[in-house]
Structure formats: C-alpha cells, structure tokens
Amino acid sequence: MPSVVVVGTQWGDEGKGKITDFLSSNAEVIARYQGGDNAGHTIVIDGKKFKLHLIPSGIFFPEKISVIGNGVVVNPKSLIEEIAYLAENGVSAESLRISDRAHVILPYHKKLDFLQEEAKGDKKIGTTIKGIGPAYMDKAARVGIRVADLLDKEIFEERLRTNLEAKNREFVKMYDSEPIEFEEIFEEYYEYGQQLKKYVTDTSVILNDALDAGKRVLFEGAQGVMLDIDQGTYPFVTSSNPVAGGVTIGSGVGPSKISKVVGVCKAYTSRVGDGPFPTELFDEVGHQIREVGHEYGTTTGRPRRVGWFDSVVMRHAKRVSGLTNLSLNSIDVLSGLETVKICVAYERSNGEQITHYPASLKELADCKPIYEELPGWSEDITSCRTLEELPEAARNYVRRVGELVGVRISTFSVGPGREQTNVLESVWGV
C-alpha cells in the first residue's frame, strides 16, 4: 500500500508539477486533492512545455489513472478547455477521473471574487480572481453545487436558481453591480457537465481500491504550506489546505494509508501576490534570480517576488505536513552568484532570536532574517547528474539545506527537464 504525497513547502511555484511528473513514472494512480484552476504548474517533456491548472501531472502517462478529488473546486469551462489543449498537443485525457463530490465554480463565483477584491482597496490579498474563495465559501455554507448536481438537469436548475437569487441580491445591494441572468449560465454549464460526464465517478472508491490492491498512489498538492488557510500567512492564503493533511479530506483516503510526504522547495524562495515575505530581495540579486529563474506566475503571468532560502519557513512546513523527504529544485538558478545566503532564524527588534514562524503578522513585521552566508559557484551545473558532479560550493549548499530543515533530500534538480532531476534516495523504495 505505498502512497506518496507531494506538497509545496513555500508559497507555491516550487516545482511540484515537475516532481509529480518525475515520481509519476513509478506510480499507478495520480490524484489532485485541493485547490482549483488558480494553481498552475509547468511540465517540460522532451523540451516541450505544458502548462496545466486542474488536470494532474499524471495525464502524460496514458496507462495511469489521473484523479481530480473531491477537495478540488472545478471550473467546468476551464477543465474542458484544458482537455482540448492536451488533445491538440497529442495527449489524451481518457484516463482522467473526476470526483462526483467535487464542488463546481460558476460565473457568479468569479464575479464575486472580483467585487470582493476590488472592495478591499489597498488591503487586497492578491487573489487570482478565479472564483476559488467564493466557491469554497459556498461549500462551507452548504449551498455549493457539486459535480453530481451539475449532471442532473432538474437538481442543477433548482440549485442554480436558488443560488443566483442570493448572489444577485448581493451584487446589486452590496456592490451596486449588475445581476447575472439564469439563462446566461444554465444551458451552457449543464452542457459542460454532459461533456465531462464520462469522467465522473466516486474517486474515493478508485483510490482506496488501488491502495488496498497494493498499487502505488501519488497525491499531488497545489499551492504550498505557506498558503494553507490554517497553517499559512493568514489572511494572505488560499481557501483550502495544501498541507499533507488535506489529502485525507480532499481525496477520501484515510490518514493511515499515507506512506511518505515529499516536500518540494526551490533553492531560493518566491511568492506571487501580497503578504509577508521575510527574506524578500529588492536589489540586483533579486532581479537576477527572477530573470534567470523565469519567475512569472503560470496562471497570472505576474512577476513573482523572490528572496533567499528560508529555513524557518521550511521547518514550519516540515512540522505541519510531517515531511519525510525533500525535493530541492532550481539550484542552477543560483549559479553565478558570488555569495548565497540562507535564513537560519529571525531577530525581533528587541534582539530576541526565534526559530519558529509567528502566526501574528504584526509580530512577523517586527522580525528580520538572520542569514548564514555560503560561497557561491560560477559553474554551469545544468548537466550535473550526481551530487558528486556538482561544484563543491553547490554540494555544500545542498547539504546545508538538508541539515537546517532536518529532512533527507531525495532529489535535487538543476533545470526544468525530467532528465535534470537527480535521485539521491527513491521515495518508492524502487
């Protein structure tokens, strides 16, 4: 019953899609357990880039099952477009399975997302305006529409009318905005449901049957621990639980069936949108890292904020997600820097040092990073295939990251390609 969870340990964009794609070669089922099409991951296969937002990375292996679990909020229109995009590039989605319990994102969710964000003025949290938060709000309020409802014309019509009445009152009275007409949504989205019907099933049964049969199952998270609604930099977070614990809720698989948790991180840190970022760089070094690392959001296209590796963040991620292994990506981006830094602790204005990540944003704003400086390296390391092939300074950097986080490094990457991911220890035991 081997199962592996892949989680982002920073603020997303750590290269989870790349690592999931890499680990998928030894998995038989690959499942997504939370988030929506606000997440974006880029996978490079034979030099060709594929950008996905909803469909699990395992879709590139036609003999494997790819699952969108019940914890995902699904935009049917986006999903159909993604299936078409894959088909145009010679990739079939026949192995895709969608949970009938997953909640559906509808146009009123996206509109509400936009209006709520605009109303915050300079206190915006940096949402992607994909309707993710409002869809999860409806889910928690027990008024959401699930995929199973979308497939039943009578139920969909009844629930859509009820929800639209409530949402339109909110649009008109609270935001002085135009209402959405029932006819604008109903037929179009019912038809989307019919197009997706062949993929819809009880995915919890598929996942548990696979695990009980001894098959290898890989769970793929979106975003990262620091964007988790409970464990992240609240309120600058997403509306779901990217932490490993989110797997059990978002896939219908019990916690006793999770074998290993692989935390994915970059050799530096990045973040899209607003919110705390203790090691953020505003100088030429930051600009160099952004440009060399192509740090622009897959979903939004926005330039990402970048900074030094933060071991305080990483130890927090280790604790709340129970990391057993680490995948360290983008080491090559740091090539050419004379000195590289790692944050080892924070210092408060009163001189006190702390090694944990504060919950209070006010307390966090009072903290400055304490850095350990290491020699950089100038060599091109993109063709290195073993730890021994790395320059001594790069090897020392990799080892120091593992020591400070306190987790074994199972893979390190020196570029975006599959062949540039190097294994130090197999998480599958093969």
From Swiss-Prot:
The job of this chain, per UniProt, is described as: Plays an important role in the de novo pathway of purine nucleotide biosynthesis. Catalyzes the first committed step in the biosynthesis of AMP from IMP.
Q: How is the cofactor bound?
A: Binds 1 Mg(2+) ion per subunit.
Query: Which annotated residues bind substrate?
Result: T298, T299, T300, G301, R302, P303, R304
Q: What is this protein called?
A: Adenylosuccinate synthetase
Specify which residues bind Mg(2+) according to the UniProt entry for this protein: D13, G40
Instruction: Please tell me whether the keyword Cytoplasm is annotated for this protein.
Output: yes
Q: Name one GO cellular component term.
A: cytoplasm
Q: Where does IMP bind?
A: D13, E14, G15, K16, N38, A39, G40, H41, T128, R142, Q223, T238, R302
Pathway assignment reads:
Purine metabolism; AMP biosynthesis via de novo pathway; AMP from IMP: step 1/2
Name the family the entry cites: Belongs to the adenylosuccinate synthetase family.
SUPFAM superfamilies named among the record's database cross-references: P-loop containing nucleoside triphosphate hydrolases (SSF52540)
Q: How does it assemble?
A: Homodimer.
Q: Which lineage do the record's taxonomy fields give for this organism?
A: Bacteria, Bacillati, Bacillota, Bacilli, Lactobacillales
Cofactor(s) demanded: Mg(2+)
From the Swiss-Prot or TrEMBL record, state where the protein is found: Cytoplasm
GO MF annotations, alphabetized: adenylosuccinate synthase activity; GTP binding; magnesium ion binding
Q: What is its EC number?
A: 6.3.4.4
Q: Which reaction does it catalyse?
A: IMP + L-aspartate + GTP = N(6)-(1,2-dicarboxyethyl)-AMP + GDP + phosphate + 2 H(+)
**Which EC class does it fall in?**
ligase
The entry's active site is D13 (proton acceptor), H41 (proton donor)
Pfam families reported for this sequence = Adenylsucc_synt (PF00709)
